[in-house]
Amino acid sequence: MKLSILVKAMKRNNGFRYDYCIAECSEHFLDDVCKPVCIDKGYSDGGCIGLAPNFKCCCKK
């Protein structure tokens, strides 16, 4: 995993509440896929968060 993805994920999770994790993120399932899935499920935001290599797509109320 790239360091920039790790830093981005750590910033996103630091102080913000992503309440519901729906899937494992992968090379083909990153923020650009995760966020629209969360929004379609009624959440306000979503992104791949966590520490490499265990990123999860989590949604925010």
Curated annotation (Swiss-Prot):
It comes from the Eukaryota. Keywords: Antimicrobial, Disulfide bond, Fungicide, Plant defense. Disulfide bonds join C21-C59, C25-C48, C34-C57, C38-C58. InterPro entries: Defensin-like_dom (IPR056373). One of its GO terms (biological process) is defense response to fungus. Pfam families: Defensin (PF24552). The keyword Disulfide bond applies. Belongs to the DEFL family. This is Putative defensin-like protein 72. It comes from Arabidopsis thaliana.
